[in-house]
C-alpha cells in the first residue's frame, strides 16, 4: 500500500529507480551519465518516490571550466552530469523529483532556472577575474587574515615561497617551478569565482594562471597543491608540476602545525577545530611515499629537518615570537603519534617504527618506513628474536654502567669469544652498506659471535681495565646496530 501511495520504503529500490530512470532517458537522448554512486545514495535518502527528469541549461555556459559545472550541478543542486555522444560534458543534466509529475517539463524548467542563475554568476566572475593577474592579486592577500596572531595569508605565501627556494631539491622539485607556484598558489582566494565557489580553490588558480601566461607546470602545480599525490601519474600534468605541488603541500601543512601549536591551539581528545590531525596525516603520506610509482623523486628530508626548515621561515618573518625548540618538539611528537597510529595501514608494526626512529641516522620518512617494514618481518623470525634479545641485554648492561669513552684494546681480551666478536664487528663495520636491507643482513650475521660472547664472557669483570674494555666493545657494537635502528625495542 505504500507504493500505491507513491512511497518506496526500500532504499535499494529507490536507488534502482534513480539509476534505471536516468539510463532510460539517457539512452533515448544519446547521452551517458557520469557515474556517481555517492550522489545516487544521497538523493535516494532525500526522496520517497524518486523520478529522474532530464533538464537543460544554456549551452553558452559550457565554456566554463568543467569543475564549475560539476560543483554547480552536483554539490549545489544534487543533479547528475551527462556527457554527449563524443564524451564531452553536455548541457543536459538529470534532476530527481520527489513526485511523478503530470508535467515533467515544469520540473525541468524549474531546475534549469536555478542552475542557469548559478552558472550566470559563475560566468560573470569567470569573465571578470582575469582582468587582474594572479601576481597582481598577491598584494591583496596581505588583507586576508591567516589566523589572529599569525599574520596574513600574504605572510604565509612568502613563507611557502622562501621554503621552496631553500628546499626545492630536497622536495624533489624544480626550484623555479616550485617557488613561482608557491608565490601564486593562494591568489585565487581574492577572485570572485572562488569567493562564490570556495570548493574551487586551487582549481581556478591553475586555470587563471594558465590563461594569464604562466607555464603549464606552474599552473598545474597551483591546481594540484590541495589534492595530495595522485595514485597514478596523470599525463595531463607531469612530474614537474606534481613534484612542486607536493612540496608546497608539505610546506603548508608543516607551516600550519607550527603556527597553531605556537598559539597553543593543540587538538584535544574531543576537538580539533583547525584540522591539525588531518594536516599531520597528510604530511605522513606525502613524506612516507617514495613516489617512484608515479615518476617522482622521494622527499629527501627527515622529519626533524623539515620542522627546522619550516620554523626558520616563521622566525625570519618575526610575525610571532620565534618558534621555540619546545614547540618544534611538540609538533614532532604530535606527528609521530599519528605515525604510530597509522602503523598497520603502513604495513609495519608500531614497535618497528619506534625502533627505526631511535636510529642514530636521521632518515627521510620514506626510508624510515622501509626500515620499519624490514624490522617487522625480521622480528617474526627466529634470528630476529635472538638478535633483539641480545640487543636488549646489551642496552640493559650499558644503561647500568657509566658511559665508556675509551676505545677497544684487543690486548686486554682474555677470552677467544671477545676476539671473535671484535673481528666480526670490525668486518661488519667495514662492509656495512647504505641500503637498509643490506644493513640488516650484515647485522643479523653478528648473531653467532654475540651469542657466544654472552655464553663465554663475564662482562662485569673484577678487573677494572678488562671490564671497561668489554663495555667499550659492547658500546661500539650497539653504535653499529643503532645506525639502522634500536633493535632492542623489538
Question: Model-flagged regions — what are they?
Answer:
Residues 1-490:
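Amphipathic alpha-helical "coupling" segments that flank catalytic cores
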